[in-house]
């Protein structure tokens, strides 16, 4: 399934050295849940190499649509399932690798009390008790949004939740909706909630209904600066980069050397 990016520390050093003499502008396509990890790692990468990075952020479905419409990208950070579909269409240049796992969490406005969600039943009751909630848009193939709607259906609360659910294009906007009082509770990937200082994020989520999602990183088949793109993808998989993930809400998934 995976075509491995295999880069030794020495080889990565050579890539960085080469990059300094021909800095490139790289376009990174990233899902919302991976945008903060990508930006955090990207800052260090730019400092080391002189490359400039810009980001296109969206749901897996939205990114797929833009890529299929012919938009240029150099590196893609997307769900494994989404990557599989893109790979079948030849949209990777033969290299993609497990990068991180993202998990679901809830958030309330900073200063408010988090509801009890210690069990599946407690989570269900918290959702029913909430005056309003926000999720990312299932219609845009948001992985968390699709999952949460299916979970409400499974719990038998789809109808009451429909009337008080505020849908946002991406999870980062879910956090904003909670912070500014549009919604009482936000439910999306933890990595999309944590960057917003206006919310308090749950440390846990009921294991019985948790749904970790694997994300991968790879070089786009439309990459204009292929060497620089490979260097960034490889850098994202290093132990140094993977160590940055937990503090910003995601679990490392790369096989670091």
What label would you give each PLM region?
Residues 4, 22-71, 78-90, 94-102, ...:
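Exported/periplasmic ABC-transporter solute-binding proteins
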